[in-house]
């Protein structure tokens, strides 16, 4: 068996860590709704919208099913940069890097910005990778509270403490 790297053995990943106890509870007869992975197909009430199915079919028929450029399709990067610019951001196509999802985006951002010993502030409640991924790069995460009764505003007193 290949040994696990020491840095990997300390990483907690709450999205998947809940699967074992949830499966045990299901075996005991409890009804569990699994929202931890974000798989919309797992829920019959959330079918893929017809226009998306049609776009997929058309893309396959046109042969648009291979690898895209590393930074993303130029048309998509253009649409994203225009949308961000319309919100007041100084954004051009060169500022846009299209990722396969938030997981990849977070890993790229953390790899590019974190050094050993860096401390990262993350809001709570949070998306579990905010806590787990910095550990991969030798950083640590400090969770701070959000005020649910105040539109999820940052609790500055909690950060200061």
Labelled PLM ranges:
Residues 1-8:
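Generic N-terminal amphipathic, Lys/Arg-enriched alpha-helix
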Residues 4, 63, 148-150:
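Glycine-rich, flexible loop/turn motifs
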Residues 105-106, 130:
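Short, hydrophobic alpha-helical packing/hinge segments within bilobed ligand-binding/sensory domains
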Residues 111-161:
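PLP-dependent aminotransferase-like
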């Amino acid at each position: 068996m290949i040994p696990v790297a020491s840095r990997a053995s300390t990483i907690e990943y709450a999205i998947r860590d809940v699967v074992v106890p949830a499966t045990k509870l299901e075996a005991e007869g409890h009804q569990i709704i699994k929202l931890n992975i974000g798989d919309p197909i797992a829920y019959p009430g959330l079918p893929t919208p017809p226009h998306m199915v049609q776009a997929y079919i058309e893309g396959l028929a046109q042969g648009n099913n291979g690898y895209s450029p590393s930074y993303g399709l130029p048309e998509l990067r253009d649409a994203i940069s225009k949308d961000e610019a319309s919100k007041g951001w100084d954004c051009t196509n060169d500022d846009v890097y299209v990722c396969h999802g938030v997981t990849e985006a977070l890993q790229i951002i953390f790899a590019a910005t974190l050094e050993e010993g860096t401390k990262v502030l993350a809001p709570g409640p949070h998306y579990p990778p905010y806590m787990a991924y910095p550990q991969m790069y030798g950083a640590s995460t400090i969770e701070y509270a959000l005020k649910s009764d105040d539109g999820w505003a940052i609790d500055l007193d909690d950060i200061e403490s």
